[in-house]
A protein has these predicted regions:
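A short acidic Gly-Thr/Ser loop motif
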Residues: 130, 355-359
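FabD-like malonyl-/acyl-CoA
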Residues: 140-141, 362-367
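A structural signal for short, well-ordered beta-strand segments
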Residues: 124-126, 220-222, 363
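Gly/Ser-rich oxyanion-binding loop with an adjacent helix/lid
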Residues: 2-34, 43-53, 92, 98-211, ...
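Gly/Ser/Thr-rich loops at beta-strand to alpha-helix junctions
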Residues: 313, 359-360
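C-terminal nucleotide
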Residues: 1-39, 64-103, 194-353, 366-404
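Short Gly/aromatic-enriched secondary-structure transition segments
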Residues: 51-58, 236-237
Length: 404
């Protein structure tokens, strides 16, 4: 079995498939097609509530949204790979559990409509070789590509800032979820050969050139069932934000202009008012911010060993945060063993980390090209031991959303 799956990114070939799927479902050519990239977070995705930073890579796992205007005010949705269709209209635009993936597009329609934008009836077709259940930013890509398609089709005068507000209303008011700016920023602002660094304190992002040679980036869906072992919301309380705020110190020579206090006595004194579990996890938040800063610093210096150390340290941090699981830890331990000197923690040649919501499934690894085949063998061994059949994708940094 081949574990390194090839995603069709051939522009002309896949575009015809997208158009054909839309024609077959609705009997008309699409009026517009938008494409947005998948995404994974390298570090920092669990610290957004504390207004820290997240380092992300938009990747060439494209999601296509084709759309055509209707003569009425209804909305129809079709997901090609799921062979599933849904429908709604403005008067019944509500979150429905049974609508699953279609709720993402419905939320964007709500985001526009609730912002005073006038909508027309639209037929939508979603084409993605990676399903939303895998993670990897597919759901966000559906939302963002839908934004671009709706704006174009309905002739809406809607700035980029207004688009971000549409997405925020979609997430908070329709879906009832947090609005993670790093997700949207990666899908919108990314450029080839760059990472996206989101600063939640400044509500902004910047591009970080990413050009390590002779390396392959792999995303692995370990297919471990997600089991939530604790509620992250219990940590995301205003009083904890205030505590960590006391430990933020200005620093002119670091990204964002601040870092967390490193004096252990000071840290212990400030965190002495919380339980041991809460203290441990707040320390993980602080450590994760340092991992993000160290990753960016190493990338800018073209220092892969330092970058890899920071990534590996971030995964250990996620374990302390109670996000990882034995199956993913097993895979990443095998990655470390691919080094000729696996005990030399100062100069790793490969690295990897759990990514996403955690509690199972997503891993990214950045390997020497010569180690990709060996990693495939480890995945075969993983399947024999744990009984899960992983899927693995070779990816690279991709451009953000655009109309085709």
């Amino acid at each position: 079995m081949s574990y390194i799956e090839k995603i069709n990114t051939n522009g002309m070939g896949i575009m015809e498939k997208v158009r054909e799927a839309h024609r077959k479902e609705y009997g008309v050519e699409p009026d517009v097609i938008a494409v947005a990239p998948g995404r994974f977070h390298l570090a920092g995705e669990h610290t957004w509530f504390f207004k820290d930073k997240t380092l992300s890579m938009a990747v060439n796992l494209p999601v296509y949204v084709s759309a055509s205007l209707r003569e009425d005010t209804s909305f129809k949705f079709y997901f090609v790979q799921l062979e599933d269709e849904k429908h709604t209209n403005l008067s019944s635009l509500k979150l429905k559990k049974e609508d699953k993936w279609a709720n993402s597009i419905k939320s964007i329609l709500y985001g526009f409509y609730s912002g005073g934008f006038e909508l027309k009836g639209i037929d939508f077709t979603i084409y993605s070789e990676i399903l939303p259940s895998a993670g990897f930013g597919i759901t966000t890509a559906v939302k963002v590509a839908s934004c671009w398609a709706i704006r174009e089709l309905c002739g809406l005068k809607c700035s980029q800032d207004q688009i971000l507000q549409v997405i925020e209303r979609a997430n908070k008011n329709f879906l009832g979820t947090a609005n993670h700016s790093a997700d949207s920023f990666a899908a919108i602002f990314s450029k080839e050969n760059n990472l996206v660094l989101t600063d939640y304190a400044k509500k902004s992002c910047e591009l970080v050139p990413f050009n390590f040679k002779e390396k392959t980036v792999l995303l692995t869906d370990a297919l471990v069932p997600r089991i939530v072992t604790w509620n992250e919301d219990s940590l995301m309380q205003p009083e904890n934000v205030l505590l960590l705020g006391e430990l933020k110190e200005r620093k002119a020579n670091v990204s964002g202009g601040w870092q967390y206090e490193e004096d252990k006595a000071e840290v212990n004194e400030v965190l002495s008012v919380v339980s041991e579990d809460t203290k441990r996890r707040l320390l993980c938040v602080m450590n994760e911010h340092k991992c993000v800063l160290d990753c960016v610093n190493a990338i800018q210096k073209y220092d892969f060993s330092s970058f890899a150390r920071s990534v590996n340290r971030s995964h250990q941090n996620m374990r302390d945060y109670d996000i990882s699981c034995p199956e993913i830890d097993w895979i990443l331990k095998r990655v470390h063993e691919l080094d000729e000197n696996p005990d030399d923690l100062r100069n790793p040649v490969n690295c990897g980390r759990i990514t996403g919501k955690g509690f199972g499934r997503g891993i990214y690894t950045i390997l020497r090209n010569s180690d990709v085949g060996k990693y495939k063998e480890k995945l075969e061994e993983y399947e024999k031991i744990f009984g899960f059949s992983p899927k693995c994708y070779s990816v690279k940094p991709a451009n953000g959303v655009r109309l085709i």
